[in-house]
């Protein structure tokens, strides 16, 4: 049951964030959006290092001086996987006027939801692979450590849910539909987590590769999407400060609970 609740916590964060559309009349200011984006980037980067890459290297200690190899290979596989999805799936970031990926006749709002969904895929995989390690009895991964990752991602999912539902509302969509689209953008997380758990439990020796794969995928999102969004235009210092806050919070959660 711990794993079941653990994989639902991040989805709950997205849903609660999307519910902001019922309580906030206006879209978020640039300063607030940069702060939330920076915070999310900090949490994801810290989670990639403390919750994924370091355990991946620790689990490969039997390889001696080559213990870094599974982490490096998995990391690059995750980067390339997200790079491929970025080119295959048509999507549109909220602050961008130009769609990415192949040409499509999809509505602007649909492509905005796809952008956040693409972002959520590695987060679901990260939670799934950590809980797979815990369920398989890996000494480096504890129930508290897995919970710390779930909580950290849920905290940064809250503003992400708001960032998708509020702009949709601002573009004329009904509140209920904007909320539903915000929620649906996070559905991929528990689905990805469950699929990752099922796959990882059958290939336990590959767990270091899967941990670092999730880290690579998450860091791709941070560098390709979040850091540019928090660094463009005005209020860039706000994004940087909240990046540090998010990183520190996730680091504290992982060390204190792990």
List where the protein language model places each region.
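Intrinsically disordered, metal-sensing/regulatory segments
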Residues: 1-258
């Amino acid at each position: 049951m711990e794993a079941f609740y653990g994989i639902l916590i991040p989805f709950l964060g997205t849903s609660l964030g999307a519910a902001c559309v019922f309580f906030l009349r206006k879209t978020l200011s640039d300063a607030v959006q940069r702060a939330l984006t920076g915070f999310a980037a900090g949490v994801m980067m810290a989670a990639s290092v403390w919750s994924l890459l370091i355990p991946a290297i620790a689990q490969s200690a039997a390889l001696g001086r080559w213990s870094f190899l599974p982490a490096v290979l998995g990391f690059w596989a995750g980067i390339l996987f997200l790079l491929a999805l970025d080119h295959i799936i048509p999507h549109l970031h909220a602050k961008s006027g130009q769609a990415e990926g192949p040409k499509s006749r999809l509505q602007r709002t649909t492509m905005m939801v796809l952008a956040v969904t693409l972002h959520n895929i590695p987060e679901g995989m990260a939670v799934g692979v950590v809980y797979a390690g815990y369920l398989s009895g890996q000494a480096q991964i504890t129930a508290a450590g897995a919970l710390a990752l779930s909580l950290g991602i849920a905290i940064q999912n809250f503003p992400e849910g708001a960032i998708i539902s509020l702009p949709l509302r601002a573009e004329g969509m009904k509140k209920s539909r904007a909320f539903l689209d915000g929620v649906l953008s996070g559905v991929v997380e528990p689905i990805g987590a469950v699929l990752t758990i099922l796959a990882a439990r059958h290939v336990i020796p590959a767990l270091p590769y899967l941990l670092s794969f999730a880290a690579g995928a998450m860091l791709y999102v941070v560098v390709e999407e979040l850091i540019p969004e928090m660094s463009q235009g005005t209020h860039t210092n706000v994004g940087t400060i909240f990046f540090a806050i998010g990183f520190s919070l996730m680091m504290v959660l992982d060390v204190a609970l792990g």
